[in-house]
Amino acid sequence: MQPQVTPAARAHQGPPSLSRHAVDTARLAAPLAIAQLAQMAMGVTDTILLGSLGPDALAAGGLGANLFFVVVTLLQGVLTSVSVSVAHARGANADDRVPGIYWTGLMLSVLLAVPAFVLLSYAEPILLAFHEPATLAKNVGEYCAVLRWGTPGSLIGVGMMRAFLPAIGAARRLLWISIGGVFVNGFLNYGLIHGAYGLPREGFLGSAAATAITVWGIAIALVAVLHLRPRYRHFVVRARPRLPLMGELFGLGWPVAITYGVESTLFLATGMMVGLLGEAPLAAHQIALNVASVAFMVPLAIGQAANVRVGYWVGAGVPVAARHAGFVALALGVGFMMCSGLVLITVPRAIVGLYLHLDDPANAHTVALAASLLGVAAVFQIVDGMQTVGSGCLRGLKDTRIPMLAAAFGYWGVGFPTGYVLAFHFELGAKGLWWGLAAGLASVAALMTLRFHRISRRFIETGIAPGPDDTDAASAAPHGHV
């Protein structure tokens, strides 16, 4: 984050160099990427330890955990509005507005936990309505009945704090506490599942309890850091949550949640289509998707950093710097994914070998198919990185509703139909479905990038900052508005 000088002085000094933008964006994104990888590691830990109880426990616990993370991830999208609002305020040298955003965002997190809690409470009847086996539905319902108590902690610790901390220059605190959470989660999972370390033996429900306790621990630790460290205390001084501000945060954030949902359902539907092709294609799909998901954490973090940095310079009233911050972030995201894609093309079998025994003849078909999907993933990753960073840049401009529509069109108007036709009419199978994903992501990436180019250029030409649902410069809010 830049030194706190007046917006007028910043404008007079001129925008930072492109290399300065690159360094600042990388410094902000690096701890966010590691924190997100730590969150993935928690899920891997849960899966491994549930697997020690057998396939039934793994199936119930895995499905219950997936339901939990899908629900809270969608609602966390609403809280991304906190990040850009704080960034705008700090850019405008209006740190006195930050506590109001903090307390209002905290209250919004608690309110959002209510529908999540209710939905998870009805996991069993929901699964029965989808004709899942009664025993599985019952076990998943019991798992979610425990895990639902972690929804407020997850929305505060992962949702609210992941948005707030980078915007005040405290991303490293999120990093270290997230890494600590991995070890706490592993300790509690093993202890509560198997009754070790003097903890009660709860079986597969112990994993749900461990996750709920861990996310609450992370939330409490992050809140404590903000309130106890003198460096951050002025950002969280007591302020009354304001209903109009909560409405603004919700209005800015709900399209992001819908965008997350549109993308998630595309991948879910693609997985279901692959499942129709047989077990080997589905296994290959899961391997390729897992590899792509790990690499995706980096551009996702760069997109979050772009959200903050673009928003900061919009608040400061320096449109050239806001535009440069966005395009430098796009270059970083695409550049990383090109390097990652090169690895996938160069050593696909070695990567597949991390998941399957290459020498086992029974795995030959799956190995070959997974290696071919990694070739598609090399292209898929580049446009995936571009679209997620582009989305972050637009959030920095408080532009979320048009990107939501662009995502819906790209994913379901282009991606799914293309994949379906290639897979089942041109008989390309799983590879065709993956080319459909790539086509959908490419269309979204192009639309996001072009929109950022147009709005940021207009900001430079008019000097009027964009606002929510920006469609005309004359109707946008004055620069510096939060």
Predicted regions and their residues:
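Small-residue-rich hydrophobic transmembrane alpha-helices
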Residues: L58-F117, G157-G169, R173-L174, A284-P348, ...
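Short runs within selected transmembrane alpha-helices of multi-pass transporters and secretion channels
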Residues: L79, S83, L147-P166, L174-V182, ...
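Short alpha-helical transmembrane segments in multi-pass integral membrane proteins
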Residues: M1-A29, V86-G153, V184, G191, ...
